[in-house]
Amino acid sequence: MAIKITFLGAGSSVFVRNVLGDCIIHPELEDLTFALYDIDAQRLEDSYLMLHAICAHYGKSVKMEKYVGVEELPQALTGANFLICAIQVGGYDPCTISDFEIPKKYGLRQTIADTLGVGGVFRALRTIPVMEMFGKMAEKYCPNAVFLNYSNPMGMLSGYMERYCNVQFVGLCHSVQVAVPKLFAGLGMEYDSRVQWKIAGINHMAWLLEVSKDGVDLYPEVKRRSKEQGYPENDKVRHEIMHRFGYYVTESSEHNAEYMPRSEERRVGKECRSRW
């Protein structure tokens, strides 16, 4: 069965490489068409060439189409089975910089500003009109497509799309997949396919409820190493949260320092705030 995947924001080369690159090498996915859409022609071309290089490296054949600008969006959407969205409206400079600088001016310091707080709201207000446009056009040109969104703030965008667009919408984040491997790497623990874990929670703050290997609970060893070795330099906030609440969280210490800057001030807050 032919599958058409439309990537909205295909100038996001890292997401294109990781997501569509996985699709290219996955043996169950054959007869693929990638419709790559962006408003930046040069960045779109870069992603297009990168995907061709990946196909050549793995000896795969994938049909690829490029679409630039809103005028070509209907063609990109028509007949799509899946939509993948990874956009940043306005670019990093000046928009994202302002998400930090404006709140900071009034004493509200943020370290990531893509999830909640003033920066998260700013980003949502910029992004919602574009997401709504995608959703309304998807209703017309690919009404049965599944809309997979990687854009932040994922929670706010997902809530809006669920309420105001008639599309099958799913919000995703890569932090769940990488949380346990990164935790183990920071503690010098071996990670392989036998490690099993269960995670549940909200975006950018899901909780690692269980982690085991061959039926053996590994949480005691994780906590022992964390205490005895000291918290990894780049992950102090999450380790502090784990020892206070009993569970490790999926999103980075940079994110969590922003969520709870006062609760962690005494032990790791000052260091994290200056570092991040």
Give the ranges of each region predicted by the language model.
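Metallocofactor- and cofactor-centric catalytic cores in central/energy metabolism, strongly enriched
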Residues: 2-99, 112-113, 120-191, 203-208
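Short amphipathic alpha-helical segments with coiled-coil-like heptad repeat character
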Residues: 157, 275-276
